[in-house]
Design a protein with these regions (language model features):
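C-terminal binding/interaction regions
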Residues: 2-58, 63-80, 84-113
Length: 113
């Protein structure tokens, strides 16, 4: 099967397929993703002062984020299962109502993060 040069998940007939990575060498691979969450001042204050009755929001979000990163192959079509060797999620309040979230992942394998 010959692959398209523009997009590796399409063959020359334009059909979608999962890329064969069986002959690729293992290498260390890393990724960093980040974004901002903007919220009402009252919401930010409740999170920062831990006034949410269900528990500490950022700790729950950290666990959920790590779980989601480990299961990326279930969320992105044609994504290979990647055994993460590290996943770290950090939060940083940029201002009163803006929370920056960063996720760093690492693996050693034949396909990356």
């Amino acid at each position: 099967m010959v692959q398209s040069k523009e997009f590796t998940h399409l063959n020359t007939q334009g059909e979608v397929h999962m890329v064969d990575i069986s002959e690729k060498n293992d290498t260390e691979r890393t990724a960093l993703a980040y974004g901002e969450i903007h919220m009402l001042e009252a919401t930010a204050e409740a999170i920062q002062t831990q006034m949410i009755k269900k528990g500490e929001v950022l700790q729950v979000a950290r666990v959920a984020g790590i779980t989601a990163a480990k299961r990326t192959f279930e969320w992105i079509p044609l994504c290979h299962l990647v055994a993460l060797t590290k996943c770290e999620i950090q939060f940083d309040w940029r201002n009163q109502t803006c929370l920056e979230v960063r996720c760093f992942t690492k693996t050693v394998g034949s396909t990356g993060v």
